[in-house]
Amino acid sequence: MSKYTILDKINTPSDLKLVPEGQLKELASELRTFLVDTLDVSGGHFASSLGATELTVALHYVFNTPYDNIVWDVGHQTYIHKILTGRKDKLITIKKDGGISGFPKRSESEYDTFGVGHSSTSISAALGMAIADRLQGKHSSSIAVIGDGAITGGMAFEALNHAGGIKEDILVILNDNEMSISDNVGGLSAHFSKIISGGFYNSIREKGKEVLKNIPPMFEFVKKIETQTKGMFVPANFFEDLGFYYVGPIDGHNVVELVKTLRILKDHKGPKLLHVITKKGKGYTKAESDPIKFHHVAPSFHSGDAQSKASKPTYSNIFGNWICQKAAKDKRLVGVTPAMKEGSDLIRFSQQYPNRYFDVAIAEQHAVTFAGGLACQGLKPVVAIYSTFLQRAYDQVIHDIALQDLDVLYAVDRAGLVGADGATHDGSFDISFMRCIPNHVIMTPSDENETYHMLELGYEYKGPAMVRYPRGAGIGAEITDNLDIKLGKAKLVKKGSRVAILNFGTLLPLANQLADKYHITVVDMRFVKPLDEQMINQICQNHNIVFTLEESSIAGGAGSAVNEYIFANDLSKNITVRNFGLKDEFLTHGTKDLLLDYSNLSFNKIAEVLEKLLSHKK
């Protein structure tokens, strides 16, 4: 007999609506069990979905999806949503080659109303949908589900301000898992939340306002009393000042109460915000105790046979070690990150130097300009940021840092392909969008040792500098004391004939493999900006074929920089140039090796091109 007696009957929200309300609590339990069993095989984002289980059930139970629009923020919490919207049997393929995405994706399901992966976008998207539907005569509901972390992003506040200002009919659900369901959320507060979300209260409240508006002093007095009374229990004032009708906080794990409240709010017109309190990792004891550790789980995490982590240090570890060692030597060093402490390996730094560590939350724009302010007053800020999130601070990088030539070092993690997380998290574009900015140094280390020493060089450089490095473990290169890296100078790694590979970054082992078979020259270029023009001149004079190699976008990338120099200096007459990098498209999720091969960044794909060119050159 199946242990999923209710869930087995559900494939779509239409099936869910047939479940008696009294069985929803049991359904939530089955969903959690199914999630544990499935991710124990596949791995994936875990704790967030556990925390949003009842909320997800209630949303699809009350609203008419996909006619009504549910927009999820970030997307880590959407595995239960995927289970309930026709992808239950595919969940085991999540983030795998050819499987479903780990995030909402419009091309995957009509229930995924808006593609996401980055933070703080949901309210803006839901507001746009609400207005579009209204203008086209469609009587739908638009709901944004946003977490307490994501709502700290400036874009979320911009959207709240807009929605409240125009009084658009939109529901924002604040999924707050920062606090537990404690006494101040239960008891009087829960009772008060029930009262203020009730239809009778709403009716009396609105009709009373109309009457009292004719008596201005009395209206202001009553309004003040209501605000102060609610303020005793809930953080209503801020959202109501923005024009939202605030309800909550309520228990986000009481599915019956959620259903009741959502039904009431569905009929309440105008901007409204429902504040729900949840516990990340709910229902799985270890995840409740350590939600950060169980944010994402590996296969066999539950059965106890999970694979051990790689013994080699990751590039993030190299950065984490470097910044702690450098901070011990230079009191000017300060670390800045937009909510990436764990991912960027800044935990130890934050513990050793708490007064010099600044986590500015999900606020990439602020992080960069804040770093500029620190630099103006004589400190040396190191901004630890993922490549994909650096995109969000582009104007600040140009206007606030580069234009003023401020002394800021960007430690750009997750540069290149990230594999299972897919296009929303790939670091494909940082070289392209940073290369065109004056006053910038861009470094592409080929291994851990170069990463360490380029961080050192970037720190000592006076002006904006960027070191980009990939996700995951390196090749195991030892960190030495005597690596000689000079600004803008490449390194000749192997000397061959006819063919040269100009490598930018950690694909150097691939270049060396090709060199071993075809006796070709390999250059570790190290710098995209400034380019080693002397090395390029030398290569073009002594070779017939030049390949550039990078794990970043070909369009505007390092290879493009080489092309520009070659053609600007009339060096192309006797040589053939080919650029190898990421194609001009958004890649899907999958294993990194598969994605590299698809991008022609594999031994066989490059060798095929090389052999064709060599045969034509004979």
From Swiss-Prot:
Binding positions for thiamine diphosphate per the UniProt entry: H76, G117, H118, S119, G149, A150, N177, Y284, E364
Cofactor names: Mg(2+); thiamine diphosphate
Cofactor note: Binds 1 Mg(2+) ion per subunit.
SMART domains per UniProt: Transket_pyr (SM00861)
SUPFAM superfamilies per UniProt: Thiamin diphosphate-binding fold (THDP-binding), TK C-terminal domain-like
Catalytic reaction(s) noted: D-glyceraldehyde 3-phosphate + pyruvate + H(+) = 1-deoxy-D-xylulose 5-phosphate + CO2
Pathway(s) annotated for this protein in UniProt: Metabolic intermediate biosynthesis; 1-deoxy-D-xylulose 5-phosphate biosynthesis; 1-deoxy-D-xylulose 5-phosphate from D-glyceraldehyde 3-phosphate and pyruvate: step 1/1
Keyword Magnesium: yes
E.C. number: 2.2.1.7
Molecular function in Gene Ontology: 1-deoxy-D-xylulose-5-phosphate synthase activity; magnesium ion binding; thiamine pyrophosphate binding
Highest taxon of the lineage: Bacteria
GO biological-process terms attached to the record: 1-deoxy-D-xylulose 5-phosphate biosynthetic process; isopentenyl diphosphate biosynthetic process, methylerythritol 4-phosphate pathway; terpenoid biosynthetic process; thiamine biosynthetic process
Xref: NCBIfam families: dxs, PRK05444.2-2
Family from the record: Belongs to the transketolase family. DXPS subfamily.
Full protein name: 1-deoxy-D-xylulose-5-phosphate synthase
Gene: dxs
